[in-house]
């Protein structure tokens, strides 16, 4: 607001022109705005990392909302009775190119792959006759966990949890793939996606490569990522000769979250894993799959 001239005697104080003061204040506010927005939006996100849900209707609403926002991967277990309530959201996710792994629990023994309720809802569908928790993870970042009683009964004191935390979601995915998925029975597997295609979700890459291999059409891949031994950037180009996975039968992975490619390159075979890979040669960030025309 003022300019202080303390290098002269006596010290003088001069008021700055109002237009100049306003311009400086406006400039300072504009400079502060991004930092303030980030700070307070971060606090808001942290406050919303966990939400307690007390009603079946809200659980279904949260599932639909998360499915609508899915960009790369969905893992869902839901009862056969509730499946029709989220069928459209699941089908939309599949149409967007999202990998959808679905377990239908509390399913009738005569449920088959041609049932209209299952049409277009997932890349892989498994069923389990027993009741199990409703569990959803989306993009390994957010999801919902609900006990069976909350969806079965209108009056119960059981509660569900919705979460948005990148540290927790991979643990839930690991539990889904390690506990629920193996216990269920494979019912339907979608056809391979058209090529060429690019995936940032590595499990989707592995699924598509597996389906191509089993159809006698081994694909060619270009992998962008890093070498796991020295963290240096890596680019791997070659033909997929093997996959290790637990999504479709017969499975051949050694532990539940192991999903990898074995790529034959000009310099020999290279193993490729997804985010957090440590037993493979390369951790992939992006994979392009193409027909092998050689």
Name the predicted role of every residue range.
Residues 1-294:
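Acidic, polar-rich N-terminal leader regions of halophilic archaeal proteins
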């Amino acid at each position: 607001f003022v300019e202080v001239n303390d290098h002269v005697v006596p010290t003088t104080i001069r008021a700055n022109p109002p237009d100049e003061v306003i311009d400086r204040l406006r400039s300072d506010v504009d400079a502060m705005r991004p930092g303030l927005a980030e700070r307070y939006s971060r606090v808001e996100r942290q406050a919303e990392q966990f939400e307690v849900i007390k009603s079946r209707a809200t659980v279904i609403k949260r599932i639909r909302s998360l499915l609508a926002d899915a960009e790369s991967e969905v893992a869902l277990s839901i009862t056969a009775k509730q499946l029709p309530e989220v069928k459209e959201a699941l089908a939309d996710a599949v149409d967007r190119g999202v990998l959808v792994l679905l377990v239908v629990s509390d399913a009738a023994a005569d449920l088959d792959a041609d049932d209209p309720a299952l049409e277009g809802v997932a890349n892989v569908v498994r069923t389990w006759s027993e009741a199990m928790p409703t569990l959803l993870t989306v993009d390994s970042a957010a999801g919902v966990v609900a006990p069976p009683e909350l969806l079965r009964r209108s009056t119960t004191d059981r509660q569900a949890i919705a979460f948005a935390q990148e540290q927790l979601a991979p643990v839930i995915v690991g539990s889904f793939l390690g506990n629920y998925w193996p216990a269920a029975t494979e019912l339907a597997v979608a056809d391979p996606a058209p090529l060429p295609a690019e995936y940032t979700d590595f499990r989707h890459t592995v699924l598509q490569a597996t389906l191509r291999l089993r159809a006698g059409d081994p694909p060619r891949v270009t992998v962008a990522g890093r070498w796991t031994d020295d963290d240096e950037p890596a680019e791997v180009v070659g033909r997929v000769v093997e996959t290790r996975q637990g999504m479709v039968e017969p499975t051949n992975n050694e532990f539940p979250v192991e999903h990898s490619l074995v790529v034959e390159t000009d310099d020999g075979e290279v193993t490729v894993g997804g985010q957090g890979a440590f037993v493979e040669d390369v951790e992939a960030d992006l994979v392009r799959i193409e027909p092998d025309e050689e």
